[in-house]
Amino acid sequence: HLGRKWGCKTVAEIADLWPESIVAYGIAGPHNPAVLALRRLEKWIYKKADALIFTMEGAYDYIVEQGWEKEIPRAKVHYINNGVDLEQFDYNKEHFRVEDPDLNDPNVFKVIYTGSIRRVNNLGLLLDASKCVKDPRVKLLVWGDGDERAALEQRVREEHIGNVTFKGRVEKKYVPSIVSRADLNFAHNSFTYLFNYGISFNKLFDYFAAGQPILCDFPCRYNPVVTYGAGTEVRDPQPQEVAAVIDHLSEFSD
């Protein structure tokens, strides 16, 4: 309507698939009246826009699976992923440095996770994998917070998982200092079929900017970590498999 009123083109940017995300995470079923109403709105937006920009590379696969390809042509669908301001990243890396004994220890193989610590993030798998790691130099260092943190810290204490440390939350400006000193940055989340359309986590681009290897432990049809040779993907995210990859990569730091 605004496009017609002002005589201009309309471009819609889609960073998340709604309402599909509601269904994928089990918040509501596909036939829920609210989901059906949002689906109609979603299709209307896609049809009326002159161009669509998705942050997921495989978003047109989703459109095809919905049966909308005749009304929404491929030519008007574009992919622009999230990103990071490299100048700001480098500035923050130099001016907001985190002083941490593990980060500063050259004898520690630092596997770093930054981000939310909620049930959907499934950090319990990382604890299970850490228990299977054989290299004594490996430490999983977790920066972030969330409602699952206390329970996971309790697991670490009760199960004597000595190679995992929760560091707490830091301001975003300190993240470049942390991830740039990793030996391995960990891109981790609970798998959902939405990943088949691509991934564009903000923290993933912090990892790219850091220039350190990335371990991605969930299968993904469009994975920029693999596409651009920025790290390794674990197709079967079981604790033993993840631990084996970490042990293998730690050998290269000798």
At which residue positions do the language-model features occur?
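Carbohydrate-associated surface elements
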Residues: 58, 80-83
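Nucleotide-sugar donor-binding and catalytic loop/hinge architecture
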Residues: 71-72, 91-110, 250
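Nucleotide-sugar-dependent
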Residues: 121, 171-178, 185-208, 215-226
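Conserved donor-binding/catalytic core segment of Leloir-type glycosyltransferases
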Residues: 102-130, 141
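Membrane-proximal helix-turn-helix segments that form the acceptor-binding/catalytic region
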Residues: 2-8, 32-52
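Acidic anion/phosphate-binding donor-loop and adjacent secondary structure
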Residues: 64, 83-100, 122
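Nucleotide-activated donor-binding/catalytic signature segment of Leloir-type glycosyltransferases, i.e.
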Residues: 135-141, 150-184
